[in-house]
Amino acid sequence: MATKYEMSKTYQYRKVMKPLLERKRRARINKCLDELKDLMAECVAQTGDAKFEKADILEVTVQHLRKLKESKKHVPANPEQSFRAGYIRAANEVSRALASLPRVDVAFGTTLMTHLGMRLNQLEQPMEQPQAVNTPLSIVCGSSSSSSTYSSASSCSSISPVSSGYASDNESLLQISSPGQVWRPW
């Protein structure tokens, strides 16, 4: 008879605990779905008050994750490709900014975009690797009357440290005579 009593006790325990555990599980699922709905509403720029069904929340999440996965496929693998991709994005942003400004000279915009395009073409050409790392570079400092050649260890007083950051600012003042010259936009 003791076995029957314990079985009924176990049976009663299961009868009470199973629905309680199921309620807790559903509460966890609903809480996570609510959090997911809020997060996805931010990501897809919708209001958080929209009435989404659970299936809608999951579908939007799956779509968003697929878009993220696709965008990561287009990320360049090496630093040169990454630099080129960033350069192209920056040039496109400059183009959009020039188009949106009302009183920009068309000739200026054309010249700037042509310059950026030429620099991009130079970037896309295969670069030569420098042959020797330890050899000093020759720097030619130009002035209105004469040019003087200095080694990389000596200073060049005619070059101003303040510039706009474009290589064209210093082209007449500074010429680096080394094989595999590389242009940098900074």
From Swiss-Prot:
Keywords of the record: Developmental protein, Differentiation, DNA-binding, Neurogenesis, Nucleus, Repressor, Transcription, Transcription regulation
Domain of life of the native organism: Eukaryota
Motif (WRPW motif): 183-186
GO CC entries: nucleus
Cellular location(s): Nucleus
Gene Ontology biological-process annotations: cell differentiation; negative regulation of transcription by RNA polymerase II; nervous system development; regulation of neurogenesis
InterPro entries reported for this sequence: bHLH_dom, HES_HEY, HLH_DNA-bd_sf, Orange_dom
Function in brief: Participates in the control of cell fate choice by uncommitted neuroectodermal cells in the embryo. Transcriptional repressor. Binds DNA on N-box motifs: 5'-CACNAG-3'.
PANTHER family: BASIC HELIX-LOOP-HELIX TRANSCRIPTION FACTOR, HES-RELATED (PTHR10985)
Subunit structure of this chain's protein: Transcription repression requires formation of a complex with a corepressor protein (Groucho). Forms homodimers.
Protein name in the entry: Enhancer of split m7 protein
Origin species: Drosophila melanogaster (Fruit fly)
Gene that this sequence comes from: E(spl)m7-HLH
